[in-house]
Regions:
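Active-site acid/base region of carbohydrate-active enzymes
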Residues: 1-43, 71-74, 78, 84-105
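Residue-level signature of the C-terminal ends
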Residues: 13, 56-59, 139
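A structural signal for well-ordered alpha-helices, especially hydrophobic packing surfaces
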Residues: 53-60, 80-83
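Extended ligand-binding clefts on enzyme/binding-domain cores
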Residues: 39-46, 77-209
């Protein structure tokens, strides 16, 4: 079945055994800092993977496939453990676990991204909880530390703030996506965080862009 194949792909994308995907990880935040855009072991993608595994386990269980449901639950638990032990920075989740850029390839050029420490690997990101929205909209709460996620959202919002909203992360100081700000705001609402006053910033941005 297609769902099983997709879940297997995400499992195979982790080659280090910590649950975090490190293959095929370049995303569509094409104006973001390298750590956000194409680093390996991204927290943003790990949370998405965890969400995928938990809901796939529910689907497998409802179809009588207890074995595969167990595999998916185990993968979700592994990601959660890595999030708590390796990604948590005390007041926020890091952008990624990859701290060096020596083996990272820029997917746009096909060339090495550089050498030395990866700038922004431990930055504050507004995308951490991105993968939670669809499960939350359907009434399902993933097995995660929501107190930490709420702190992450609050602190990332503060650290990435500019006049018209937040950049991708505190390592990005120019590009802003209103759509991803709104997505963050929706997830925040489910955690009891009221970011409604951000709407005035987004409207001011639209007015500025269209004047």
């Amino acid at each position: 079945p297609l769902i099983r194949r997709l879940a297997k792909y995400v499992i195979d994308a982790d080659t280090t055994g910590n649950g975090f995907p490190d293959l095929g990880v370049a995303n569509t935040f094409d104006d973001a800092a390298p750590a956000v855009q194409f680093s390996r072991k991204q927290v943003y993608l790990a949370v998405k993977a965890l969400a995928a595994f938990e809901v796939t386990a529910l689907m497998a269980e409802s179809n009588g496939d207890e074995e595969f449901a167990g595999i998916c639950r185990d993968r979700a638990a592994l990601i959660q453990q890595t999030l708590d032990t390796e990604a948590w920075q005390g007041d926020h989740y890091a952008v990624c676990l990859e701290k060096r850029m020596d083996e990272i390839t820029d997917p746009w050029s096909g060339k090495p991204a550089g050498t030395g420490e990866l700038p922004g690997w431990d930055a504050y990101s507004i995308h951490t909880a991105n993968g939670l929205l669809y499960p939350l909209l359907s009434g399902y709460r993933l097995n995660l530390d929501y107190a930490r996620l709420a702190r992450d959202i609050a602190h990332a919002t503060r650290e990435a703030m500019l006049e018209y909203g937040c950049t991708h992360s505190s390592a990005d100081r120019s590009n802003l996506w209103v759509s991803q700000n709104l997505w963050r705001d929706f997830v925040a609402a489910y955690m009891g965080l009221d970011l409604l006053d951000m709407a005035s910033r987004y409207w001011a941005f639209e007015v500025m862009e269209n004047t």
